[in-house]
């Protein structure tokens, strides 16, 4: 008879009977009684009153009975901590039992009893088990240390268990090694700064040796540990990859994904032009494809991970697109994932196959899948320009099916295609308008309204179409209302005489009858714009639209890099970092991809998580591309006594918050105007997306002896009709100066000098007019010191410290660019308190930390600290670790950004390691350049 009989009893008063049976002299009776107790406990009955009687049954040689008693103990020890102490002697005795299975069982149960009162009694038995002659006992004891650490971390450290764990990494048994690694990794997760694992080439070699002989779980533990190691160079990275690659052919999909994670991380360190790099990319494809032949649930997990891999390195699977074609019997969750990856892999070479598949999918019966397929056709058109016409034709065929949800989704994606390829496919608008009456979804209605408004001049009855939407204005969603408002304003600007009544009607509905603040605000903006300056309104509302990006749903680069570090875990399925869904008392250590140390000369950007990925993204909406155009379009009239600024024009532009609006209306400050009449600059709110990053602040200063970059020629005479300008930037008495030398190499004299800066990353502008009062005669030079401040408008530049300047004289207007060395923007109050420094360092995410090498520097730590302090870089603390001098430093920029630094100096080694952390990591490479310049001059 099976053990199910223990779960079928309905007796009353059975506790008393069980108590008697537990104390029976016969072993079999006691064993039966314990089974009944466990069964009662399993179904939720309270049998805690039997605790002392069950504990008495521990004194037995029967392994099955001992397991049952231990199970009972684990369940009730927390609610009966005082009685749990009764079992301590039995644990100690069992840990010395000749049977290794009993020793291991005892130590495993010890780790599972989470009672503070008895942990101290368990230290000695655990210490013996960690050095036990039997590997099964040692591997069980290793896991017990991690469990004990979670209960009482301080005691584990004091008792030296962590050192014992580290010793087990060199154990002769691979499973002991794997469990020791698993335990140390878990402890390290909760104490990220402890460096418990102490990964070095020797330990890594031991782990790789154990890898081949472990069980599947052991291999996963070791591979996960390897993924946290940063090899010292690409040769070591390649060596590890060669020994991990065989795991790709493992039968267990978890082992395969763990191996892929290691290889994806180490690919960052391999030179991209090497044969091995390309060979490794080819080796990664087959195992990923094989994962898609498993069960649907395994396929889904594999596809979610492949989605990340394809975003990071699409070249791995670019030849394997057919395996992502949907099968008729795939579950919907697998179909949607495959569809997403298909689009990511779509290219000119395979677009015909992809489109044929998508058209077929669009005739399926599953509504969600069909919608996604139609949307995918639009994404193909946007991504692969050569296929756009074929995609539009396919969408028109689908619209002809008259299936409601297909038509609506098709109209939404055609709107995006119009945005991507303006004035190319407008001939299909008539076909779209035929389906107006069938549109009942907000997205589709908004898309159709946008199309009618954008191409109103090509649609004869555009006013009637928009008026039909206006009839139920208050019943529409906010999205449709906003789109309709803009569309009617566009229509009015294109056909003012015919639509005046219509535009007044929609403005009245938006501003007077609506409770939605967004709608009201937009209505008021349009109303004031139209009534104040219709010409400007036309320029604003009908301006050329920025192109839409090819991939709108790519994961943000730094998050993608973090998720690559979590391949094979729940984070890679959710596409969220662990701290977004795991609550822990210690928090979660953020991971990031290793930094390639191939090039660290001054001026080079580190190939890190932030810098590379941002540079690789296609920049569709320009952030500074038109800025030089802004300077070129400046209307520079002759110098006047008082600079005129058109308040009406500037007001209109400010109202619309244009981040790229031109500098028209901001006249030059001529040199003839006395400083007292110069307009005082006011901080401008610029819609550039950087206001939070670059908060404008005042107060700058530099200690005497600060570094000054050598003068450079900014404007050669051959490009400026004989005017040559060279210069640099300095800090004196707490002010920033632009030190310039003007040389006249022309044959005529020069007068009426004026200067203006374009918007820049730090809001740098002249504090006073350019003061050159006497004519500059041929072959004459003059030195000019122009005071600057940081109160001007902010616009992110590329590079970040780029400054675009316009200089005018009686001959012409000339333009040049120069780079501001960031040390002139370091402020005097950049010294942090020690506690604040420590808290801030921990608070800034680890992916924001970038490392650089400062080469060929022969200064000691004190000299370095003194030199940097002269430039407002303050040393907060200094300590010596294993012969290395560690300087912890802080500095602050004029816009309020704090940068924290750790500088490692090894006496006798001319190469210093600089680690920088700040909330705006794009600044770090420029700070590194400043460090390099200061310490080498």
Curated annotation (Swiss-Prot):
Domain of life where this protein originates: Eukaryota
Protein's UniProt keywords contain DNA-binding: no
Tissue expression summary: Expressed in the brain (at protein level).
Keyword vocabulary terms for this entry: Acetylation, Cell membrane, Coated pit, Endocytosis, Membrane, Phosphoprotein, Protein transport, Transport
GO CC terms in record: AP-2 adaptor complex; clathrin adaptor complex; cytoplasmic side of plasma membrane; extrinsic component of presynaptic endocytic zone membrane; glutamatergic synapse; postsynaptic endocytic zone; synapse; synaptic vesicle
BP terms from Gene Ontology: aorta development; cardiac septum development; clathrin coat assembly; clathrin-dependent endocytosis; coronary vasculature development; heart development; intracellular protein transport; kidney development
Record bears the keyword Protein transport: yes
Membrane topology classification: Peripheral membrane protein
GO molecular function, one term: protein-containing complex binding
Gene3D superfamilies the UniProt entry points to: 2.60.40.1150, Leucine-rich Repeat Variant, TATA-Binding Protein
Modified residues (Phosphotyrosine): 737, 928
Region of interest (Disordered), residue spans: 593-617
Modified-residue entries (N6-acetyllysine), positions: 265
Regions of compositional bias (Polar residues) in chain numbering: 607-617
InterPro entries xrefs: AP_beta (IPR026739), AP_complex_bsu_1_2_4 (IPR016342), ARM-like (IPR011989), ARM-type_fold (IPR016024), Armadillo (IPR000225), B-adaptin_app_sub_C (IPR015151), Clathrin/coatomer_adapt-like_N (IPR002553), Clathrin_a/b/g-adaptin_app_Ig (IPR008152)
Main location: membrane
SMART domains hit by this protein: Alpha_adaptinC2 (SM00809), ARM (SM00185), B2-adapt-app_C (SM01020)
Location within or outside the cell: Cell membrane; Membrane, Coated pit
PTM-bearing positions, type Phosphoserine: 4
Residues carrying N-acetylthreonine: 2
Family membership noted in the UniProt record: Belongs to the adaptor complexes large subunit family.
Quaternary structure annotation from Swiss-Prot or TrEMBL: Adaptor protein complex 2 (AP-2) is a heterotetramer composed of two large adaptins (alpha-type subunit AP2A1 or AP2A2 and beta-type subunit AP2B1), a medium adaptin (mu-type subunit AP2M1) and a small adaptin (sigma-type subunit AP2S1). Interacts with EPN1. Interacts with EPS15; clathrin competes with EPS15. Interacts with SNAP91; clathrin competes with SNAP91. Interacts with CLTC; clathrin competes with EPS15, SNAP91 and PIP5K1C. Interacts with LDLRAP1. Interacts with AMPH and BIN1. Interacts with ARF6 (GDP-bound).
Role played: Component of the adaptor protein complex 2 (AP-2). Adaptor protein complexes function in protein transport via transport vesicles in different membrane traffic pathways. Adaptor protein complexes are vesicle coat components and appear to be involved in cargo selection and vesicle formation. AP-2 is involved in clathrin-dependent endocytosis in which cargo proteins are incorporated into vesicles surrounded by clathrin (clathrin-coated vesicles, CCVs) which are destined for fusion with the early endosome.
PANTHER family tied to this protein: ADAPTOR COMPLEX SUBUNIT BETA FAMILY MEMBER (PTHR11134)
Official protein name in the record: AP-2 complex subunit beta
Gene expressing this chain: Ap2b1
């Amino acid at each position: 008879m099976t053990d199910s009989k223990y779960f079928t009893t309905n007796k009353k008063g059975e506790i008393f009977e069980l108590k008697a049976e537990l104390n029976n002299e016969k072993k079999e009776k006691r064993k039966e009684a314990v089974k009944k107790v466990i069964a009662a406990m399993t179904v939720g009955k309270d049998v805690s009153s039997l605790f002392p009687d069950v504990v008495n049954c521990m004194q037995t040689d029967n392994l099955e009975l001992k397991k049952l008693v231990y199970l009972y103990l684990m369940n009730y020890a927390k609610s009966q901590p005082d009685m749990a102490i009764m079992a301590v002697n039995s644990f100690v005795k069992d840990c010395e039992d000749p049977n290794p299975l009993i020793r291991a069982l005892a130590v495993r149960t010890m780790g599972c009893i989470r009672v503070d009162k008895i942990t101290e009694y368990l230290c000695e038995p655990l210490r013996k088990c960690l050095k036990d002659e039997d590997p099964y006992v040692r591997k069980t004891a290793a896991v017990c240390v991690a469990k004990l650490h979670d209960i009482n971390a301080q005691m584990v450290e004091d008792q030296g268990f962590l050192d014992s764990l580290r010793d087990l990494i060199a154990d002769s048994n691979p499973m002991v090694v794997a469990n020791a690694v698993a335990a140390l990794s878990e402890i390290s997760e909760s104490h990220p700064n402890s460096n418990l694992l102490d990964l070095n080439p020797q330990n890594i070699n031991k782990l790789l040796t154990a890898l081949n002989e472990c069980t599947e779980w052991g291999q996963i533990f070791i591979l996960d540990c390897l993924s946290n190691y940063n090899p010292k160079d690409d040769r070591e990275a390649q060596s590890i990859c060669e020994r991990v690659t065989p795991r790709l052919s493992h039968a267990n999909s978890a082992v395969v994904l763990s191996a892929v994670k290691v290889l994806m991380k180490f690919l960052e360190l391999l030179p991209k032009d090497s044969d091995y790099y390309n060979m490794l990319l080819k080796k990664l494809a087959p195992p990923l494809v094989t994962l898609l032949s498993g069960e649907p649930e395994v396929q889904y997990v594999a596809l979610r991970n492949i989605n990340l891999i394809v975003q990071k390195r699409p070249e791995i699977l670019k030849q394997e697109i057919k395996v992502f074609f949907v099968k008729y019997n795939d579950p919907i969750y697998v179909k949607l994932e495959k569809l997403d990856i298909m689009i990511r892999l779509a290219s000119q070479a395979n677009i015909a196959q992809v489109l044929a598949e998508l058209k077929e999918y669009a005739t399926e019966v599953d509504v969600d899948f069909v919608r996604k397929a139609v949307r995918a056709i639009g994404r193909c058109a946007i991504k692969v320009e050569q296929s756009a016409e074929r995609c539009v034709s396919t969408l028109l065929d689908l619209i002809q099916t008259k299936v409601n949800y297909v038509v609506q989704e098709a109209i939404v994606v055609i709107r995006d295609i119009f945005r991507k390829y303006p004035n190319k496919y407008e001939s299909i608008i008539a076909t779209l308008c035929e389906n107006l009456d069938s549109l009942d979804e907000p997205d589709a209605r908004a898309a159709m309204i946008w199309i009618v408004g954008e191409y109103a001049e090509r649609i004869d009855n555009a006013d009637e179409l928009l008026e039909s939407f206006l009839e139920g204005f208050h019943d529409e969603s906010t999205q449709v209302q906003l789109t309709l408002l803009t569309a009617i304003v566009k229509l009015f600007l294109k056909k003012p005489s015919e639509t005046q009544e219509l535009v007044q009607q929609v403005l009245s509905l938006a501003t007077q009858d609506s409770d939605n603040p967004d709608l009201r605000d937009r209505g008021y903006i349009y109303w004031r714009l139209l009534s104040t300056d219709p010409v400007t309104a036309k320029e604003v509302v009908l301006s050329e639209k920025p192109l839409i990006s090819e991939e709108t749903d790519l994961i943000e680069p730094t998050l993608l890099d973090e998720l690559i570090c979590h391949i094979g875990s729940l984070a890679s399925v959710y596409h969220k970092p662990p701290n977004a869904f795991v609550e822990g008392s210690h928090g979660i250590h953020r991971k990031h991809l290793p930094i390639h140390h191939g090039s660290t000369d001054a001026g080079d950007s580190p190939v890190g998580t932030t810098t590379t990925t941002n540079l690789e993204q296609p920049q569709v909406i320009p952030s500074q591309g038109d800025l030089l155009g802004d300077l070129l379009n400046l209307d520079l009239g002759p110098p006047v006594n008082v600079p005129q600024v058109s308040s009406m024009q500037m007001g209109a532009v400010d109202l619309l918050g244009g981040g790229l609006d031109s500098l028209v209306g901001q006249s030059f400050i001529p040199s003839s105007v006395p400083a007292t009449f110069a307009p005082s600059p006011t901080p401008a709110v610029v819609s550039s997306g950087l206001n939070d990053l670059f908060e404008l602040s005042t107060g700058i200063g530099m200690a005497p002896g600060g570094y000054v970059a050598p003068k450079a020629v900014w404007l050669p005479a051959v490009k400026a009709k004989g005017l040559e300008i060279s210069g640099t930037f300095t800090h004196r008495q707490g002010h920033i100066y632009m030190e310039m030398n003007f040389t006249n190499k022309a044959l005529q004299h020069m007068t009426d000098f004026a200067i203006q800066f374009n918007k820049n990353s730090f809001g740098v502008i002249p504090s006073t007019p350019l003061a050159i009062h006497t004519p500059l005669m041929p072959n004459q030079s003059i030195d000019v010191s122009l005071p600057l401040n940081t109160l001007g408008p902010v616009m992110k530049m590329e590079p970040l410290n780029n400054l675009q300047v316009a200089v005018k004289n009686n001959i012409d207007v000339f333009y040049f660019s120069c780079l501001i060395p960031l040390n002139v923007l370091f402020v005097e109050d950049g010294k942090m308190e020690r506690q604040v420094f420590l808290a801030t360092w921990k608070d800034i995410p680890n992916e924001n930390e970038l490392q650089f090498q400062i080469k060929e520097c022969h200064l000691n730590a004190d000299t370095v600290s003194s030199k940097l302090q002269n430039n407002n870089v303050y040393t907060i603390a200094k300590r010596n670790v294993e012969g290395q001098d560690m300087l912890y430093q802080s500095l602050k920029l004029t816009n309020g950004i704090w940068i924290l630094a750790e500088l490692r100096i090894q006496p006798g080694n001319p190469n210093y390691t600089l680690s920088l952390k700040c909330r705006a990591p794009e600044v770090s490479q420029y700070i590194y350049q400043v460090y390099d310049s200061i310490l080498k001059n």
